[in-house]
Amino acid sequence: MARLIEDEAGISALVNGLKRVAVLGIKTEGQRGQPAYSVPEYMQRVGVEVVPVPVYYPEVTQILGQPVFRTIAAIPGELDLVDVFRRPQDIDQHVDDIIAKHPKAVWFQLGIRNDEAAKKLVEAGIDVVQDRCLLVEHSKFAAK
């Protein structure tokens, strides 16, 4: 049963199962210093397949050496997680797209919380983490 994951055991189980992560709102190499680039770069470095889904940059065809997709639903294959780098008020426009793909979980990065979107995702059977940094939690809980 899907749930809002807030406990450390749930976070640990989630980050230890990550193999393929779509990053909604990923930045390009030109914004290397921003978390929306550095977090997915870290995830790729530790062996997680990163699927870039930029919201802007229509001319960009690759980020982190991977082909970009313009929607979550267009990504072939299964996703363990959609890592979201969008302002809280901008998440609602992506909920149906995320539900259509049905990843195992959705992660709203540190400072990002949208309870209504989280509720819809959980009701659709998708686990949700809000207001936490994936890089911090992964480096804290990932099996060494």
Describe every region a protein language model picked out.
Residues 2-83, 91-144:
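Structural/interface elements that position substrates and couple domains in central-metabolism enzymes
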